[in-house]
Amino acid sequence: MIKKKAKSAVSIVIVLTLLVVSASAAVIQPRWTYIASIVCSLDISDSGYATLYGGGSAPSPDVNKVKVIVKLQQFKNSKWETLNTWTATASGWSARTSTKTWPVAHGYSYRLYVTLEAYNGNTLLESASQPYNYGFFQ
């Protein structure tokens, strides 16, 4: 009877240990120190016009200026080529470009490449980039 209880106790300890290890392995670490999010939207009409915007936020008391750089890119000749670039800078901790429209050609893949820069005054604290793939435009 004592051996049975000891085996049960050991089994419970092993299960609890596995649960603790699993829980600690599932902790999500932040990708950036200051930047919280990068957002964008890209839609292409049947007539071949890309409508897009990009933005992001860095909600930290250390951040007082944010700059967003949005590149519309086309996959051509086995590489991403930038068709146009838009930039917006804002005081505070968030920035967003206005909605832009740009003509694109059928038969290529497109994406937005968005970079967000967080500043304290003129000192760059952090820069992060995020691609958003639209896919192939027939």
Locations of regions flagged by a protein language model:
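Sec-dependent N-terminal signal peptides of Gram-positive bacterial secreted proteins and lipoproteins
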Residues: 2-25
